[in-house]
């Protein structure tokens, strides 16, 4: 419960530093390094000047209040009673409003008393960078937002492109992300922008790569501190598209996406789930590898990011040490074990197919030491993965 010591997982900044090959001492165990802040360690604490412990006589008089007269005292009591009556009416109205609110299905249980659920944010209270006081509200909002922004099955409406072309493009974009050393968030947002645009616009075969690099340009501007320039994308496409072409496509994609790139990402939900499960670096990295495999596969585009994140962590935990999907994980992920098993099975089939797949960018990427060579572990060819794959 609250008293249980919990391993605090890496923050977004530390995780990205680790992915870029920049070491952070003891990232996942014991003490963690401080997180990056834009304006150093600034707090709202105001330090008052000390007067050597002495208070001047004239200052004491300034703090004294005059005794109220009977007339003013009666007026104060009357005002207080009126305020209390108004506040009581507001409280009753708030309770009535709360009773009328329908909770979403995936919100599960909102209290910790019904199940053995740990409050994973308790230790973060008082740390302004972790937003522990309203982190639960943030994730409830993200759950609603992902349902509104998830792309539909758009490929049947496309006349010149198909599943294979999309997979080739995404596989190449993953290589570009590694080449430019971009954040993981940038990669996921790139694919979401790509799919959202294709969901609304028919694209010619000759312009598909243009749409892909423009999506990465937009995602870089949204996520990166120092985004690549348009000229970098002209170079990476071997001058297939001019700067002007990319600018024109950028305007077109901005309008199609309604200037809204606030997509909740799989990574956001995975970090929350990993904290709830108190998982180590190996399980967390394996879950990231499994999630990234789904980017290439068109079948997963209609899945909610939260569902993909939950399924990836569940499969990772089963592959490494057969860990249980605890009530705490059910509560914070929003998914029971039975709810995610169909997605886990599809993910298992996809993982087993990687040996014969033409799309090796993710597998090669996670074979590097900074990703713990996770794509080479023997569990990815073991009987546990086959058992889940056979459920389909």
Swiss-Prot record:
This is G2/mitotic-specific cyclin-B. GO terms for molecular function: cyclin-dependent protein serine/threonine kinase regulator activity. Coiled coil: none annotated. Pfam families: Cyclin_C, Cyclin_N. It comes from the Eukaryota. GO terms for biological process: cell division; mitotic cell cycle phase transition. It comes from Hydra viridissima. Keywords: Cell cycle, Cell division, Cyclin, Mitosis. InterPro entries: Cyclin, Cyclin-like_dom, Cyclin-like_sf, Cyclin_A/B-like, Cyclin_C-dom, Cyclin_N, Cyclins_cyclin-box. PROSITE patterns: CYCLINS. SUPFAM superfamilies: Cyclin-like. SMART domains: CYCLIN (SM00385), Cyclin_C (SM01332). Essential for the control of the cell cycle at the G2/M (mitosis) transition. Interacts with the CDC2 protein kinase to form MPF. G2/M cyclins accumulate steadily during G2 and are abruptly destroyed at mitosis. The keyword Cell division applies. Belongs to the cyclin family. Cyclin AB subfamily. Signal peptide: none annotated.
């Amino acid at each position: 419960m609250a008293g249980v010591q919990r391993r605090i997982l890496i923050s977004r900044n530390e995780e990205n530093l680790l992915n870029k090959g920049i070491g952070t001492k003891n990232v996942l165990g014991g003490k963690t390094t401080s997180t990056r802040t834009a304006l150093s360690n600034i707090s709202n604490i105001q330090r008052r000047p000390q007067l050597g412990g002495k208070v001047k006589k004239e200052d004491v008089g300034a703090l004294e209040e005059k005794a109220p007269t009977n007339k003013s005292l009666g007026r104060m009591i009357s005002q207080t009673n009126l305020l209390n009556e108004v506040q009581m009416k507001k409280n009753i109205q708030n309770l009535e409003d709360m009773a009328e609110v329908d909770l979403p299905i995936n919100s599960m249980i909102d209290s910790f008393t019904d199940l053995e659920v740990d409050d994973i944010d308790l230790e973060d209270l008082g740390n302004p960078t972790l937003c522990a006081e309203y982190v639960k509200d943030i994730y409830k909002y993200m759950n609603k937002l992902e349902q509104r922004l998830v792309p539909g099955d758009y490929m049947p409406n496309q006349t010149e492109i198909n599943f294979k072309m999309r997979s080739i493009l995404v596989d190449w974009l993953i290589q570009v992300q590694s080449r430019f050393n971009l954040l993981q968030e940038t990669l996921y947002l790139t694919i979401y922008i790509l799919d959202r645009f294709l969901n609304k616009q028919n694209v010619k075969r000759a312009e598909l790569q243009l749409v892909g690099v423009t999506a990465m340009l937009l995602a870089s501007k949204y996520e990166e501190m120092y985004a690549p320039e348009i000229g970098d994308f002209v170079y990476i496409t071997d001058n297939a598209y001019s700067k002007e072409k990319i600018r024109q496509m950028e305007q077109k994609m901005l309008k199609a996406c309604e200037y809204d790139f606030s997509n909740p990402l799989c990574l956001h939900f995975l970090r929350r789930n990993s904290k709830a499960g108190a998982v180590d670096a190996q399980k967390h990295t394996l879950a990231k590898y499994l999630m990234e495999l789904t980017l290439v596969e068109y079948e997963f585009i209609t899945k909610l990011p939260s569902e993909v994140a939950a399924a990836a962590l569940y499969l990772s935990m089963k592959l490494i040490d057969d860990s249980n999907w605890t009530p705490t994980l059910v509560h914070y992920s929003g998914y029971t074990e039975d709810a995610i098993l169909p997605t886990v099975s599809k993910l298992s089939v996809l993982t087993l197919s990687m040996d014969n797949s033409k799309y090796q960018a993710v597998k090669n990427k996670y074979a590097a030491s900074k990703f713990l060579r996770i794509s080479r572990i023997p569990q990815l060819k073991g009987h546990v993965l086959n058992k889940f794959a056979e459920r389909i």
